[in-house]
């Protein structure tokens, strides 16, 4: 028996891939909130807020109820939650983890992981080496936690992970949520 412990080759998205289509497909498979569009001058927090606002995952006007909502009340608070500056050369694994990892239960990441890694690499290339990447914590990309898998919420979900990138005239938002 000849077993190979070599990692498989990277998933090939094809020549000149439509990253928006691939991102949407992975998001559909993994139930993620995603946005890929032009950089229209919004900052990371405002962009994240605007993408999340129509989802029902924000409660900006709540502050007096007994539920104890934990998410941000404004784009400024969302910006403060996105406090981890991810170097562009490290953004691809953050993207892939946010696209596929279950935030509540550890386990299988499914067959879509190689595609998510390819999409992450493609998005990093699209936004370029000068892109500004931000994340709200290490609940998805646990490898970046350095001992503490903490996060600052960007939604009202029990668990959430967000990666937001702006660069080269493009902007991307990827948000995962989980409930236990």
PLM segments and residue spans:
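Acidic, proline/glycine-rich low-complexity IDRs
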Residues: 110, 114-180
């Amino acid at each position: 028996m000849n077993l190979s412990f070599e990692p498989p080759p990277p998933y090939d998205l094809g020549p000149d891939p439509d990253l928006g289509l691939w991102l949407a497909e992975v998001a559909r498979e993994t139930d993620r909130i995603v946005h890929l569009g032009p950089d229209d001058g919004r900052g990371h927090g405002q962009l994240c807020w605007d993408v999340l606002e129509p989802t029902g995952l924000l409660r900006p006007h709540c502050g007096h109820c007994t539920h104890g909502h934990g998410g941000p009340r404004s784009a400024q608070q969302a910006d403060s939650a996105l406090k981890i500056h991810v170097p562009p050369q490290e953004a691809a694994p953050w993207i892939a983890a946010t696209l596929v990892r279950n935030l509540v239960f550890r386990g299988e990441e499914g067959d879509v992981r190689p595609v998510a890694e390819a999409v992450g690499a493609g998005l990093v290339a699209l936004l370029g080496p000068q892109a500004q990447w931000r994340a709200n914590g290490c609940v998805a990309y646990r490898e970046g936690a350095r001992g503490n898998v903490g996060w600052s919420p960007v939604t009202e979900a029990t668990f959430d992970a967000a990666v937001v990138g702006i660069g080269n005239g493009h902007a991307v938002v990827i948000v995962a949520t989980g409930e236990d």
